């Protein structure tokens, strides 16, 4: 399964907002807007199929500027999205047995290409 999300992928864990009354933290508005748009994009443009068993994932992030970003933050956001949309049952290590992340810069372009293969299929690479 291969698909592309034409959005900048925000960090879920570094952009949290804390309720001062309760002390609970929540994902930021930017993250929630991205998540809602990404779910809608996937459901509109791709046939969502649940993948059972172990998988390997390749992520390619294209960044619109050269600002510093940690790759693992975007990775976590994408993994959570895959679970929330129903492609994966969980994002734990027993499901995602291996993942590969690459990053590149293209002025003014933000997107993430996601490739998912069953771990026992030999993968696309």
Predicted stretch roles:
Residues 1-125:
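Catalytic phosphate/metal-binding cores of nucleic-acid and nucleotide-processing enzymes, i.e., regions
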């Amino acid at each position: 399964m291969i698909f592309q999300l034409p959005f900048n992928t925000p960090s879920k864990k570094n952009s949290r907002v804390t309720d001062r009354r309760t002390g609970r933290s929540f994902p930021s508005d930017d993250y929630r807007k991205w998540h809602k748009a990404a779910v809608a994009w996937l459901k509109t443009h791709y046939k969502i199929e649940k993948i059972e068993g172990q998988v390997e994932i390749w992520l390619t992030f294209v960044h619109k500027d050269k600002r510093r970003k940690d790759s693992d933050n975007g990775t976590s956001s994408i993994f959570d999205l895959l679970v929330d949309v129903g492609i994966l049952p969980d994002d734990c290590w027993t499901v995602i047995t291996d993942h590969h992340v690459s990053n590149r810069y293209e002025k003014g372009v933000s997107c993430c290409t996601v490739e998912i293969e069953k771990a026992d299929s030999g993968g696309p690479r």
